[in-house]
Amino acid sequence: MRLPPNDCSLAGTVQQGRDMMFAQLAGVDMAEADFYWAMFHDAVLEGAILARCDLRGATFNSANLRRADLRGANCGLDNLGGSTDFIGADLSGADLRRANIAGADFTGAKLIGADLSDANAVSELPNWRLTWFRGADLTNARLAGARLSGATYDDRTVFPRGFNPNEAGMIRFIGR
């Protein structure tokens, strides 16, 4: 999907179940749109505005969401894993309950106050990419029941008060 020239908004639209595979939507304003069960496989959404979107059940395998604004988005039950790139994205206040985040890269992402309750960062597949939280800010994030075993973090990662990444089975990454 490509928008017509000079059209850079899907804000507030209803796109339920829409096939957005390979869509080129970098920088597009999609705030408060309804993408319930939409497919974003290999989509380019770099810098897109997806704040307060309904993304429940959507799939994002191998999508580029670098620096995307997903503040307050409802991503519950989503498949956000499979090498999806959230580097530098803002997911503050997002609902990621029961989302599959295995293989996603949250390096430098803001997950302040996000709800990752029962989210799954563990893949059952061999040779699967690790889930990265290097330099991510998880201040006040809810992690109850989240399966984070094998996910990586580093010294810059900020966790909620009282959360112990080692007890959750996370791996400390040393290096660049």
What are the functions of these language-model segments?
Residues 1-176:
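Tandem repeat scaffolds
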